[in-house]
């Protein structure tokens, strides 16, 4: 599945559940929440959680958690992009161009 197909799948999936209709500021809150969960997953991978009320997970379990949380972030980014009719391909090209212009080698 390429990026455009995945973006369309996310759009359809969220639409079918009515999740795309949420106010954009609620969606931004979800994105912030998921970003925090990415930070927590990275902490578990890098330094551990060291909490007596949580079981210690293996590296692979922690890595899989990070994969899932990155997916949640990406899903929220796609919903926001879809709301404003922005393809991820457009985002990729724009970001690449911005970085290339800003940090071009002389």
Predicted features along the sequence, with ranges:
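Flexible "arm" and connector segments at domain edges
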Residues: 1-70, 74-106
């Amino acid at each position: 599945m390429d990026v455009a197909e995945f973006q369309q799948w996310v759009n359809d999936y969220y639409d079918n559940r009515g999740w795309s209709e949420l106010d954009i500021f609620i969606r931004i809150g979800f994105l912030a929440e998921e970003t925090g969960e990415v930070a927590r997953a990275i902490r578990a991978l890098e330094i551990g959680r060291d909490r007596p009320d949580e079981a210690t997970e293996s590296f692979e379990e922690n890595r899989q958690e990070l994969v899932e949380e990155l997916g949640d972030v990406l899903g929220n980014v796609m919903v926001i992009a879809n709301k404003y009719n922005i393809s991820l391909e457009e985002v990729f090209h724009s970001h690449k161009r911005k970085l290339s212009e800003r940090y071009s080698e002389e």
